[in-house]
Structure formats: structure tokens, C-alpha cells
């Protein structure tokens, strides 16, 4: 696949990680479609289109994202599925609503975007997908049952996509971060040392690597990005 002015769809683009990924990919010359429930801000120099009020738990919204990307740019080379969410809740105080919400926010959003983009990638026999899993996908910690289960499903989705489409030149990988250094996490954990956490810009660099030709032989992987946690 040519890396000349590639086009990437970034979901969850209004959040800290989404902004970091957009900035990094934009600096590499990517043209970007930035998607979120809220209107993503973009001040970079790259060619970018921002669209808010997109609910990726709805398949029709995901399909419209793909349609819009094709209309704006005439090609799609990569999808970075960042849209998601986290709830800390111990099981004794939890409810099925929490599990359903975590599934919708983390799994449905990724599934719907992958379902929407796969026909295009299969037709062009090439495409790159990076999903955001979590270190908790392999082992849940205190209060993270629903979140860990959802992120484990994202990792399994990634593995299946890679296995099913590798003969078509489609690569799917996931990154598995621990705690991201964001204002919300600093507020929630004031006694922790954020120097041990994962910088969104560092994680953006890993995502950019997975989208590059240097990672052409990496497929179906879950890449731990855990800082010093």
C-alpha cells in the first residue's frame, strides 16, 4: 500500500488520545477524518475533516462515516478505533447495565466501524486497522471486570479480523495500554505518580508505527504499552 498522502479515520478523536493520534498522523502527512460524539478540535496543518454527533454504537452511523471519508478524500487507508469508555465498579456493587454500557462503548463501536470498512478494504485488497484494547484485556484488576471483559473482546475481534483477512493484505492490530496520563486520570488518582503512566503521545507513536510499512509483518498482535505501571 502506498504511503503517499494516506487517509485515516480516527474515532474518539475529541479525547486526549484521539487528539494525540491526530496530531502525530497529521505530522506524517495523513489526511484525516476525525469522528466523535463531540465535535473534535483540529488545529494541525494536515488536511482534516472533523465530524461530531456520531454515535458509533449505531451501525448506520459507522457506515455514514465510511461514506463521508470516501466522499471527502476518495480513498481510505486506515482506521484507528479509539472511541470507548471506562467505568470502575466492583462486581458486588455492579449491575448488568454497567456491563452492557461497557460493551456498547468499547466493543460495539469497534465492531460497527470494522463492519463498515471491511467491504472497502476487501475490495481494494489492503487496509490497516488499529483497535484500542487495554492491558486489562489479559488480566482484570480490582473494579475492572466489565471494562476488562469488553477490552478482551476488542482484542479477540482484532485477532479474528487479522486471521480472516490476511490473504487480502488487510492488517489488524491492537494496542494494550495501562493508565493513560490524562487530566481525568490525574484528578481520579491524585496520589499516583503520572510519570509512571503512558503518555498519549507515546501511544500515538506506537499506533503510527503499526500503520507504517515498518510493521508490515505484524498482524493480529496485541501490543502492550504499559509505561512503568
Q: Locations of the language-model features?
A:
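Residue(s) in the substrate-gating loop at a strand-loop-helix junction
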Residues: 134
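Alpha-helical segment proximal to the catalytic Tyr-Lys
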Residues: 119, 163-164, 216
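Canonical Rossmann dinucleotide-binding motif of NAD(H)/NADP(H)-dependent dehydrogenases/reductases
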Residues: 2-32
Amino acid at each position: 500500500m502506498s504511503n503517499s498522502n494516506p487517509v485515516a479515520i480516527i474515532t474518539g478523536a475529541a479525547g486526549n488520545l484521539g487528539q494525540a493520534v491526530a496530531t502525530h498522523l497529521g505530522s506524517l502527512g495523513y489526511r484525516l477524518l476525525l469522528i466523535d460524539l463531540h465535535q473534535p478540535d483540529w488545529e494541525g496543518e494536515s488536511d482534516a475533516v472533523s465530524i461530531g454527533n456520531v454515535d458509533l454504537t449505531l451501525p448506520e452511523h459507522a457506515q455514514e462515516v465510511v461514506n463521508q471519508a470516501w466522499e471527502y478524500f476518495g480513498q481510505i487507508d486506515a482506521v484507528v478505533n479509539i472511541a470507548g469508555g471506562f467505568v470502575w465498579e466492583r462486581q458486588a456493587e455492579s449491575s448488568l447495565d454497567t456491563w452492557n454500557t461497557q460493551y456498547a462503548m468499547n466493543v460495539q463501536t469497534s465492531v460497527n466501524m470494522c463492519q463498515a470498512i471491511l467491504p472497502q478494504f476487501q475490495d481494494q485488497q489492503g487496509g490497516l486497522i488499529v483497535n484500542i484494547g487495554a492491558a486489562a484485556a489479559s488480566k482484570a484488576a480490582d473494579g475492572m471486570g466489565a471494562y476488562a471483559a469488553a477490552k478482551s473482546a476488542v482484542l479477540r475481534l482484532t485477532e479474528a479480523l487479522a486471521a480472516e483477512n490476511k490473504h487480502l493484505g488487510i492488517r489488524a492490530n491492537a494496542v494494550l495500554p495501562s493508565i493513560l496520563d490524562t487530566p481525568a486520570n490525574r484528578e481520579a488518582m491524585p496520589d499516583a505518580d503520572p510519570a509512571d503512566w503512558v503518555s498519549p503521545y507515546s501511544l500515538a507513536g506506537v499506533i503510527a508505527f503499526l500503520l507504517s510499512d515498518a510493521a508490515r509483518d505484524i498482524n493480529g498482535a496485541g501490543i502492550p504499552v504499559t509505561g512503568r505501571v
